[in-house]
Amino acid sequence: MATITECRGALDRLSDGLARADGDVRGAAALDRSLSCHVTDLDTTFTGRLADGRIRVDSTVQGPPPAKAQIRLAMTGDDLVAMVDGRLNFAKAWASGRVRLEAGFRDLLRLRSLL
């Protein structure tokens, strides 16, 4: 089982990858939205923002997200690490229910290029 530190590191690597991206991925990452990532097996939530092509983690809290972020992710720690490392396809994991993504319809359309 991935640790909180490993999950935070995965989010940092994802942020770095978004910052280096170009084209459609860069455009999708250019949103300015509140973000939460609930790591279900650790019952820990990272909250922050997707802004300027990066993910900024502002806090780590026990339990589910304390507020409803505009973009909400939920998955196990192992799935988060595997997805960021390229060992888990996000679209397949999302379709099978292993990963949950909730956002407004327009945001989902823009985020699809990240999938």
PLM region spans:
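Feature captures hydrophobic
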Residues: 1-115
